[in-house]
């Protein structure tokens, strides 16, 4: 595959699909502990089962060389590889993985980070936003403010350095995807989703919108 000449900064929302795709029984366990921040708050037996699952998936990601099989393991990997026309990522791009600050959310994103680095993508950063995985609306709103603050502090510099900023929103929780879709109009050049066929990406360009987003957030 010919490497693209455009420098890209790719921001991917990350959920727990890489964990829940392992079967119905483990999915229930993950849902039960989705909002837990400290793994020591989980009973020993359940915690060990989840830790073993994470180790197994990490090994599978390292050993699996088929893109089609990798895409089935994770919505995030599916979206990222489709962004590269069903090839492995370009090693010269920058990737931010937006995750919740829960234990399972951070572990799932760490698996993706390790996979990307294993594909020689060196500039990969996991961004765990405080309270973005909160179970209460009041706490989640604090997470929203934190995510907006991160975008405003981090992403404009990439555009100034002539990078194309892509929001890759195929993974992550629906509430976070909806928020990121709004933020994309201010901080990204395009947003990508998997089309209904499951084999193509829908590219949504940034609209020419100007608004003091931080001021709006403070008012609400």
What are these regions, as identified by a protein language model?
Residues 174:
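Polyanion-engaging groove/track-forming segments
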Residues 170-171:
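Glycine-rich beta-strand-to-loop/alpha-helix junction loops that act as flexible
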């Amino acid at each position: 595959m010919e490497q693209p000449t455009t420098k890209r900064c790719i921001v991917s929302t990350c959920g727990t699909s890489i964990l829940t795709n392992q079967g119905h029984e483990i999915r229930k366990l993950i849902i039960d502990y989705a909002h837990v921040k400290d793994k020591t708050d989980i009973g020993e037996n359940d915690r060990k089962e989840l830790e073993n699952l994470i180790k197994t998936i990490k090994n599978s990601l390292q050993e699996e060389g088929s893109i089609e099989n990798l895409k089935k393991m994770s919505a995030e990997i599916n979206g990222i590889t489709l962004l590269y026309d069903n090839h492995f990522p370009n090693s010269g791009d920058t990737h931010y993985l937006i995750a919740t600050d829960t234990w399972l959310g951070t572990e799932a994103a760490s698996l993706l980070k390790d996979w990307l680095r294993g594909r020689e993508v060196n500039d990969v950063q996991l961004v765990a936003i405080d309270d973005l995985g909160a179970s209460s609306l009041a706490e989640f709103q604090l997470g929203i403010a934190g995510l907006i603050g991160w975008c405003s502090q981090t992403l404009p510099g990439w555009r100034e350095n002539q990078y194309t900023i892509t929001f890759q929103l195929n993974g992550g929780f629906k509430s976070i995807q909806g928020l990121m879709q709004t933020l994309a109009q201010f901080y990204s050049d395009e947003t990508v989703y998997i089309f209904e066929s499951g084999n193509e990406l829908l590219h949504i360009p940034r609209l020419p919108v100007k608004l003091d987003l931080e001021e709006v957030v403070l008012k609400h």
